[in-house]
Amino acid sequence: MRSSATCSRRKARRRPEEDEPVNAPTPKAALAAPLPQRERPAEALPGPSDWSFELIEQYHAVIRATAERFGLDTYPNQLEIISAEQMMDAYASVGMPVNYRHWSYGKEFIATEKSYKRGHMGLAYEIVINANPCISYLMEENTMAMQALVIAHAAYGHNSFFKGNYLFRMWTDASSIIDYLVYAKDYVAKCEEKHGLEAVEDILDSCHALANHGVDRYRRPSRKSLAQELADRKDREAYAQQQVNDLWRTLPRKAEKEAAAETRRFPEEPQENLLYFIEKNAPLLEPWQREIVRIVRKVAQYFYPQRQTQVMNEGWATFWHYKLLNTMYDDGWLTDGVMIEWLKSHTNVIYQPPVGHRAYSGINPYALGFAMYNDIQRICEHPTDEDRQWFPEIAGTPWLPALDQAMRNYKDESFVGQFLSPRLMREMRLFSIVDDEHEDELEVAAIHDDSGYRRVREALSRQYDLGSREPNIQVWNVNLRGDRSLTLRHFQHNGRPLHEGAHEVLKHVARLWGFGVHLESVDAAGEIRKRYQVPGPAH
């Protein structure tokens, strides 16, 4: 079965890189208002529990036409029907259709399988991959109503977000990721054959432990095609080794040059991307090991935007599956039975347990994102005086362009900081708590009232700042003339110390660096509060 969207039982495709800008497709202008329905159907689409490929195509055609009426700009779609076991396999390999082998994926698969069989967890109805074409996995155990929900949610909601949001446009190349993963899988497999499973596994273990510290947070990476990458790899390996040799050259020097070298700091400025620094400068890594470090950090970079947009991304997909399927029902395409079935699932997804409820584990990103996009539409269509005061730039304006602008230009932190309204804070009964280490009790710092709106919004916005959730650890210095040790520096956020497992993570840094590693944890005043030290591995 093929169309501009395709439906089949599995497949794969491409890859990102450095040194060449991405030719991201120009985004379409948002529609000022939804387009009218073309014609009303004589009867609704069939709504049996069991699906068929033909029926999925019929539903998909109507969903696609409805999405076009709202101006959703998406990559071409590729739908894959997979089994529950394949869905668990996709879970274990971070949702990608192809990946290199690593024991952690097998461990995750077994844990997921056991929980699923014991009834302790359900499986996602879908997994969607930011690729061009956009790949959406539909589980074959789904009913037809759930397949329709998944197509609207993943193939049009997530897909349009991947294509439109600035973080994904800046940091990822959807047309190349699948080919890159194929390349990574083949390269790691060849390394296993040549150097042994244990040697490759050791490198991957350490790289995975440091993956979140292997991304560029502020500098936009440029990219090469897969063909360019393969052609340039040998030149890059030779050049990198030459640079390492130059850095660690130990030929005798004149006394004045030695004195200057003693005061030389390397790197001249702190470096935030630890894996990049190790790839380029670790003294003892072989070329194949550097390439594996590069592979892990490239994959980590691909997932970086997703870690910053969960509320926006899931909220956007939920908003659009709700909008598209309701529109289809109003237009006469869906039966009452199909409508009730997907609405039940939708209601469960956006449920927000109250504080104190045994199911409460924080704010549900689906609930918050869905509520915020609905609230933006309300502010545009039916603004109150309060809305006009808080959101003068969008109050009373067409809602489609306002929603499109919000989706494209924000991440979770700034989205909440810009668009969370007093009305929504009241409806969700939000409040802010301060946990002061010097106090015995928690303090309610602000509630959803006139004096607390901005403080509640700022506090919630900060929760989605990666800088407040992950430790800020930077490469500080390398002892070029002595023991070749590497010094890292941790900049505390709000006086928060590192996790007690920091020493174990440093062992992975030492394995990759090849020599001893020091870590200094400093407070806001720049004073060192704690030191960690790990010796280099035995050579």
Predicted features, each with a name:
Residues R40-E43, E54-C134, W248-L285, L519, ...:
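Auxiliary, metal-adjacent structural segments of Zn-dependent hydrolase domains
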Residues W103-N130, K185-Y239, Q243:
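N-terminal accessory alpha/beta regions
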Residues C134, E141, A145, F161, ...:
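Non-catalytic terminal regions of proteins
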Residues C134-V150, P305-T309:
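Short pre-active-site segment immediately N-terminal to the catalytic Zn-binding motif
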Residues I151-S160, W316:
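Active-site His/Glu-centered metal-binding helix of metallohydrolases
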Residues F161-S225, E314, T318-G332, K344-V355:
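Post-HExxH zinc-binding segment in Zn-dependent metallohydrolases
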Residues E262-S361, P365-Y366, F370:
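Long, internal scaffold/assembly segments composed of regular secondary structure
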